[in-house]
From Swiss-Prot:
Its EC number is 4.3.1.18. NCBIfam families: D_Ser_am_lyase, PRK02991.1. One of its GO terms (biological process) is D-serine catabolic process. Its cofactor is pyridoxal 5'-phosphate. Belongs to the serine/threonine dehydratase family. DsdA subfamily. It comes from Ectopseudomonas mendocina (strain ymp). Gene3D superfamilies: 3.40.50.1100. The keyword Magnesium does not apply. Keywords: Lyase, Pyridoxal phosphate. This is Probable D-serine dehydratase. It is an enzyme of class 4 (lyase).
Length: 446
């Protein structure tokens, strides 16, 4: 029984479950998607909240530029570039047997400090917590030069506090590195699928890593328990945190500026499609919220998940969100896309974004590795498996038979003028030997 219903009843009510349970690559275009002006109200956060987060990151820029010299060139702003992918675009055009528009890569894989999209939300939340503590203690003023936080005295102050998080890898890396640098005692609770090199890197930064034999949800639960037992411990809640979400959302306006600088037009006649790898949902949900604020109905966001971990698709499609885990349906949550190995989605994100996300699709590990090798071969970009989940998105949109494009007014003419942006979530910090093994596996599939 699953939530009081036998499996057969679930399958009869939601025929799509047959595809998910069989681990087949699946696409579902959301019939409930609504105009941004209407659906943004579901989120419970506003453009003013995102502007507040953006201003906070600007206040911290002098600190980051000093504490992390790799951010000095960008003045302490943690941002990634966008890159056209002409060779991959040509390959996908062949596969689509028609015009697809322009293909771009968003290189969060190369974000400074922790080399993944989690450098956005994770670092932001810890900075916000540090600011709150320092302001309350009278050690910092909003108009001060925040570079003053990079001092022994401030590290000693933060050393009286703890930060904890549960993670499959990249969020833990971001939280651990920034927390330790500020002076916090940091603990990362890591699930069984976390890569060894991520654990090693955290320990090298003086972070306590607690390992679990079970999956992501257990690691998060243990982190939450640690924080509940200690009033001086801040738990970064990947499933429910509004601060994480806002840290990611800042990306929307920045991308608008980047595309404008690259002379890429985004409007109803030139739609923008953004393909976001999805684990628990905080990163893609926050980014999509920021994108909807920046571009309104001209942007179409899709979430991509591994066939073995389709937690958000399952939760939104059934409307039961975090009440369901993929394991309830015999789906094992085992994937090489470690950052996406999540069995139970964020209910906050699922509900907040369910009328703003155009579609959800799943990708097999084989396809992730195939695209990993192809992108390296054609464009010279080295990405981790999770980061490739967005690559087949354009083919899913052009190949759908659910009436989605017709419903959204996405005519062949508009599709030919579209921009497709694949959000590459991580990869630059993967050790060379591990990357070589990824590439070898992918090349066997070409």
């Amino acid at each position: 029984m699953i939530l009081g219903q036998p499996l057969a009843q679930w399958r009869a009510q939601y025929p799509l479950l047959d595809e998910l349970i069989a681990l087949r690559e699946t696409s579902w275009f959301n019939p409930a998607v609504a105009p941004a002006a209407e659906a943004l109200g579901d989120v419970g956060l506003s453009a003013a909240d995102v502007a507040d987060a953006r201003a906070r990151l600007e206040r911290f820029a002098p600190y980051l530029a000093r504490a992390f010299p790799q951010t000095a060139a960008s003045g302490g702003i943690i941002e990634s570039d966008i890159l056209p992918l002409p060779q991959m675009q040509a390959l996908l055009r062949e596969e689509a047997e028609g015009e697809i528009g322009a293909l771009w890569l968003k290189r969060d894989s190369h974000l400074p400090i922790s080399g993944s999209i989690k450098a956005r939300g994770g670092i932001y939340e810890v900075l916000k917590h540090a600011e709150d503590l320092a302001l309350a203690a009278g050690l910092l003023g909003l108009d001060d030069d925040y570079a003053c936080l990079d001092s022994d005295a401030m590290r000693a102050f933060f050393g009286g506090y703890q930060v904890a998080v549960g993670s499959t890898g990249n969020l833990g890396l971001s939280i651990g590195i920034i927390s330790a640098r500020l002076g916090f005692q940091a603990t990362v609770h890591m699930s069984a699928d976390a890569r060894q090199w991520k654990k090693d890197k955290l320990r090298a930064h003086g972070v306590t890593v607690v390992e679990y034999a079970s999956d992501y949800s257990v690691a998060v639960e243990q982190g939450r328990r640690q924080a509940e037992a200690d009033p001086r411990c801040h738990f970064v809640d990947d499933e429910n945190s509004r601060h994480l979400f806002l840290g990611y959302a800042v990306a929307g306006e920045r991308l608008r500026q980047q595309l404008a600088a690259a002379n890429v037009v985004v409007d109803a006649e030139h739609p923008l499609f953004v393909y976001l790898p999805c684990g628990v949902g905080g990163g893609p949900g926050g980014v999509a919220f920021g994108l909807k604020l920046a571009f309104g109905d001209a942007v179409h966001c899709l979430f991509a998940e591994p066939t073995h971990s389709p937690c958000m698709l399952l939760g939104v499609h059934t409307g039961r969100h975090e009440e369901l885990a993929v394991q309830d349906f015999g789906i094992d949550n085992r994937t090489a896309a470690d950052g996406l190995a999540v069995g139970r989605p964020s209910g906050f994100v699922g509900r907040a974004m369910q009328r703003l996300i155009d579609g959800y699709y799943t990708v097999s590990d084989e396809q992730l590795f195939r695209y990993l090798a192809l992108v390296e071969q054609t464009e010279g970009q080295r990405l981790e498996p999770s980061a490739l989940a967005g690559m087949p998105g354009v083919l899913r949109v052009l190949g759908e038979r659910q009436g989605y494009r017709q419903r959204m007014g996405l005519t062949p003419q508009r599709m030919a003028r579209a921009t497709h942006l694949v959000w590459a979530t991580g990869g630059s910090m993967v050790p060379e030997a591990e990357m070589d093994s990824y590439l070898a596996r992918g090349r066997q599939l070409l």
